[in-house]
Amino acid sequence: MKIFLCLIVVVSLQGVLAYHIEREYAWKNIIYEGINPASYNIENSIPTAFAHDATSKKIFITVPRINPVPITLTEFDTTKHPEGSPSLSKFPGSDKIISVYQPVIDECRRLWIADVGQVEYKEDEKKFPKQNAAIIAYDLTKDNYPEIDRYEIPSIVAGNPLGFGGFAVDVTNPKGGCGKTFIYIANFNDNTLIVYDQEKKDSWKISHGTFKPEHESILTHNGAQHILKLGIFGITLGDLDAEGNRPAYYLGGSSTKLFRVNTKDLKKKDGQIEPTPLGDRGSHSEALALAYDPKTKVIFFTEYNSKRISCWNTQKSLNHDSIDAIYDGPDFIFGTDISVDSDSKLWFFSNGHPPIENLQLTYDKPHIRLISMDTEKSIHGTKCEVK
């Protein structure tokens, strides 16, 4: 797979709109560094999410623990692997985690994960005994990434942790030591939002009608259909204000609507929230993840059914006419994660494994993809550009 550096024009090739793609990785299957592929089932190594550290140029990828997945938190160096299908190495210091769905890097270069504390198949429970879900942070500024924070989420708050979706890290004092941090974790099974106050070592959950599925989503892949009914799944944070609060944008996995709530209300343990409905993105625009770019004021969405990445400028009203596509490709199958790094590079990920019963995959061509673009270039000439 060639890398298209500094692509100036938008080209159309075999139905794929390639807008300023700067980097692309594609895997037929996941190979772990130093581990014999015969010791695990490649069909069960299904990555779900990633994070890119712009300083070290490393990518961290999570692979939920399904029998017999050997490593749940992995990494590779993009300077050593600028393209292709790199093998994944074990993340240092990750021996005490069970299964992870997503990593997030904050402004202080801390890598956060939410360990669900259990495996999804009973045959693995003897090897990985069930424990409380936990929020864990690692310091990426130091060698071997030492663990610097660990908080076990009470079961009454976590609910069913196998329903953890996306989460956001809210550093309210990034220039003042990073000690005041809140974590917001979406639980799409329980239709709740979990809040963790790092400073007080406390957590609570919030429920609201907008966290529930709007409808049943029909996922179509190769003629097969699967019905999804997913509650709140993705969350991203806007710009920090003078009081240390931000707008939090969220969506349901089975919804085409977008909502906003101020983090000031999320931080109140016994408070009430009054979300603002921002609008409807249009039919077949259901997404699992979204990411805000402070530089362009644009939110990007991974639409899992349309196989595209869409955008919306937060300075505009939200409706079908204000949404545009920055990437659209038939090989971008089941987009599961998206983020903007500290260099304003947009990264988005598809794992090629839609949750369809008796899914038949062939491993003769890549189906797992990770793609990067510059945020400004990606929206040039689209409805998301504000001149």
UniProtKB/Swiss-Prot annotation:
Tissues with expression: Female salivary gland (at protein level).
Q: Which UniProt keywords apply?
A: Secreted, Signal
Signal sequence residues: 1-18
The record's subcellular locations are: Secreted
Principal location: secreted
Q: Does the keyword Transferase apply?
A: no
Question: Sorted alphabetically, which Gene3D superfamilies does this protein's record hold?
Answer: TolB, C-terminal domain (2.120.10.30)
Cite a GO CC annotation.
extracellular region
Report which superkingdom the organism of origin falls in: Eukaryota
Q: Which family does it belong to?
A: Belongs to the major royal jelly protein family.
The role this protein plays is: Probably modulates blood feeding of sand flies on vertebrate species by binding and sequestering different mediators involved in the host response. Binds biogenic amines. Binds octopamine with high affinity. Binds serotonin and dopamine with medium affinity. Poorly binds histamine. Does not bind noradrenaline and adrenaline.
Q: Under what name is this protein listed?
A: Yellow-related salivary protein ASP2
Species name:
Phlebotomus orientalis
The record lists the lineage as:
Eukaryota, Metazoa, Ecdysozoa, Arthropoda, Hexapoda
